[in-house]
Amino acid sequence: MIMLGLLTVASCKNEIKDKIGYKTPEFYFADAIEIKGEPLDAEYVASNVFKCFYTPYGFLGSMRSEDDKLAHLADLKTGEIKVSACSFGRGPEEILISSPDLALYGNSLYMLDQRADWIKKVEIHGDTLKTFDLQKLSLGEPMFFIEIQIVSDSLFVIFAENFNGEKKIVQVDRDNNIVDSVVYSFLDDENVDCGKCRYNVEMELSPCKKYLYVSSHLFSGISKYQIEDGKISLVDKVMLVEPKYVVKNGIPVMESENVILNNRIFVGEKYLYMTADPEKVSDMKEREKRAREEGRRESAAPGNDSYIVVFDYDLNFIKSYRVDSDVWHLALTPDPSVIYASDYRENRLKRYVLADLK
């Protein structure tokens, strides 16, 4: 996930877009089931959180460790790193960004180096990990490549933005041929110039490779796409909470009392899971201001109550769980009720059992 810009708080309240029929944050969180995680033994010393996937061989994922390795395979019981690969750097089989976007296909890890436009592949070979320079992305125009998902070993889905701010979801093959692409725009508002919008997104593909979900942090919403016969088509868009904003020079500016969820999504065999840290825009701006005054980098996690929210594939709300830590990345298991979460504050993995979820 890449930060594309800063959120501006609106002081004036004219032209605020009030939509009818949206849920309030309380709808998702008021009846949340409280659960506690079981921490694994290993505590990581790293510059960023361990984003990983559950595989039969261990947790396979990425973080920048003390020895500047970025790809790691960790023990499923203890979380201890068993083997590492892929150095931070400019050379072959190295990565220029410390927190690349990740995707899992089979038991291989795909890493998108957004600074170098490279797709790297990390494979498990017995007791070792091997890194391959898989593909240098080039789609005919200068683009910033943000998110990656894997349809097959020869077909990728990329979320990208060109220099005019236009955001696209692109299917591309191993020869950089564009199979299909659609323009991404979450707000249906003729007054909004989407090319000027800057916000975080995350993109996840369902295990069956048929449905693609894109979440918008700023507007706390999720778009659902279908991939069929090489075509990408929009199926549905859901605003989880009401977005109140004013439009200034084509840019939607969130009203200070608006609640954003800081939502991140993960798609399992049966459900879509979302982590959420609900926060008022005014509180977020104050938190960022304090961080600047103290000369420190503000964390991505606000330190508020954290939740795991469960939806079905049609984005219908199922239930939510209030967790005992700042969960950042989820590693889903074959059991839909058992997940592992990366704790942002403690930088370790925790095992959670989602009560009453079958």
Task: Give residue ranges: language-model regions.
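Structural signature of eukaryotic scaffold interfaces centered on beta-propeller domains
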Residues: 48-54, 100-104, 146-152, 198-208, ...
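Short, conserved, GDST-rich strand-edge loop motifs in beta-rich repeat architectures
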Residues: 161, 275-303, 352
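Blade-loop segments of beta-propeller domains
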Residues: 80-107, 114, 135-140, 324-328
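Beta-propeller blade signature
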Residues: 169-174, 293-315
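Asp-box/WD-like beta-propeller blade repeats and closely related beta-sheet repeat scaffolds
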Residues: 115-117, 124-153, 159-160
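Conserved blade-ending motifs and adjacent loop-strand segments that build the rim/top face
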Residues: 241-253, 316-333
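A short helix->beta-strand "capping" segment at the edge of beta-propeller domains
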Residues: 20-46, 316
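Beta-strand-rich domains and repeat architectures in extracellular enzymes and scaffolds
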Residues: 38-70, 273-285
